[in-house]
Regions:
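FAD-dinucleotide binding site
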Residues: 3-498
Length: 498
């Protein structure tokens, strides 16, 4: 390229111009807060479109956010965060990954899903299938739309009525039916990351759209789910995408403490971090978790966020699910099941609640991990799952082995060699797992679209934008939902500078 004096002068001028002028010159300064999958997707989309003046501020020392593939001794990598690719058609993560043969496969999680009682007895498949179908039909019933109570009231009332009066279920023991209802509630708590279905309105306006195809696709290879980050940035082996230097664009250990988005003398958005660093930006894309926004939004934004955004932050639920992986010195017994849902006899549950293992009521189910025959994972839900984060590894291991002594008493397990677990609620930079709707969401008449409303300047141009799974109306709680919102906000800026 031949550099003329005018061209050099133009570059120097762009570096010193007020924000609006520099942006008009096609050289906008863009700050992205957070280097989870939404931040990485936004940065990559912008960079490939020629908007390369990007700074990603990441509070931790790693890229990925709630995608956290971790080494687990001799077992290989496991997923402390996002576990499966949910769906195929209409899933941007699947569409990117499916280019690479063998990277995704149907998880063993989808089969050999058992109901097991605390005396170690497995519920016959013919009965378990009918109980699952009944509960799911109630949850998916359109009658919910006309109900003014909680989801818990709606489900329990209809379920018990069916069990009591419908001849189809006359052969099912009432005690077993109640055990299943408790277990189903725990399963739903894990699925939607709420503490209780009594915190959710029966008539909740849930716009979630399930993508087509298999809903539990496991990631293969040593990078596991983290492969999607490499695919997005073009660093995955065999990728044909241009490489985005995401690590060069990212500044680590940068905890954003304030975003001044209006009233600055030079027109820039001012982003301040806890270490005193200041970053000027024409545009900011905030991709931190909803949990972080709930904890910090009132102090983070100057002036305060518009009510429509703040109500969304306050109203959308952000709950916690955790995983504990156990690595045994022998394979998990073959007949144990790929997924084991826990059904408690009342006497056993009362004994648990009065013991030092009371926190273990948080465990909704155990499940095997694809291609890891020596590993078993426990899925922990709700308030007790958060409590468990504060306990030692030894205490957690002892409690889980106590559960296996009940529910797996008919099988011989090896010795636990090590455990690895997530602590999403107590992670200062995450503060939970994923979003869902609650009674508060309905009361405030809010939702993801309100959270995603951009903060605009006097010229009605977007200054601060929001991306992440909680900002997706149709695919919240998923990686592909987070990616879609990041593409949405990146496209907003790309179109602005065409």
């Amino acid at each position: 390229m031949r550099w003329t004096l005018a061209a050099v002068y133009g570059l120097l001028l762009a570096a010193t111009l007020p924000a609006s002028t520099a942006a008009a010159a096609g050289n906008p300064r863009i700050v992205i807060v957070g280097a989870g999958v939404a931040g990485v997707t936004a940065a990559s989309s912008l960079y490939r479109a020629g908007l390369t003046n990007i700074t990603v501020l990441e509070a931790s020392q790693r890229i990925g956010g709630r995608i956290r593939t971790s080494a687990f001794g001799g077992a290989g990598p496991v997923e402390l965060g996002a576990q499966w690719c949910h769906g195929e058609g209409g899933n941007v993560a699947y569409e990117m990954a499916s280019v690479f043969p063998g990277l995704l496969k149907t998880s063993m999680f989808t089969e050999n899903d058992f109901l097991v009682q605390s005396n170690g007895q497995r519920v016959p498949e013919e009965i378990s299938d009918r109980l699952w179908e009944l509960a799911q039909s109630i949850v998916e019933s359109t009658a919910r739309d006309r109900n003014t109570g909680t989801l818990g009231d709606f489900v329990t009332t209809r379920y018990r009525s069916k069990i009591r009066s419908d001849p189809e279920y006359s052969d099912i023991n009432r005690q077993l039916a109640e055990q299943f209802l408790v277990s189903f509630h725990n399963s739903e708590r894990g699925h939607y990351a709420y503490d209780s279905w009594y915190d959710v309105a029966a008539s909740t306006d849930d716009d979630y759209v399930e993508t087509e195809g298999e809903q539990a696709l496991a990631w293969t290879g040593r990078r596991g789910f983290s492969s999607i980050l490499d695919i997005i940035t073009g660093s995955f082996p065999g990728s044909t995408k241009s490489l985005v230097p995401i690590h060069q664009l990212t500044k680590f250990n940068k905890v954003v403490s304030n975003i001044r988005w209006r009233g600055t003398t030079d027109g820039y958005v001012k982003v301040t971090t806890e270490d005193g660093s200041l970053y000027n930006a024409d545009h900011v894309i905030v991709t931190v978790s909803l949990g972080v926004l709930k904890a910090t939004s009132r102090a983070m934004f100057t002036p305060a966020l518009p009510t429509i955004n703040q109500n969304a932050i306050d109203g959308i639920n952000f709950g916690t699910v955790n995983k504990v992986f156990m690595f045994f010195d022998a394979p998990i017994p073959a007949g144990f099941g790929n997924v084991v849902n826990l059904l408690w006899f009342d006497r056993d549950l009362q004994a648990l609640r009065q013991s030092k293992h009371a926190w273990a009521e948080a465990v909704g189910f155990f499940y095997r991990i694809d291609s890891k025959p020596y590993v078993l994972c426990a899925w922990l839900n709700g308030a007790q799952g958060r409590q468990a984060e504060l306990l030692s590894d030894a205490t957690i291991q002892e409690g889980l082995l106590y559960l296996l002594s009940l529910f797996g008493r008919n099988y011989k397990f090896g010795n636990v060699q090590s455990i690895l677990r997530s602590k999403w609620s107590s992670d200062r930079f995450i503060r939970g797992s994923y979003s869902s709707r609650s009674i508060t969401t309905e009361r405030l008449e809010t939702g993801p679209n309100n959270l995603a409303r951009p903060l605009r300047d006097a010229a009605n141009e977007p200054q601060v934008m929001f991306a992440g799974e909680a900002a997706s109306a149709t695919h919240y709680s998923t990686v592909h939902g987070a990616m879609e919102t990041a593409q949405r906000e990146a496209t907003r800026l790309i179109n602005l500078y065409k």
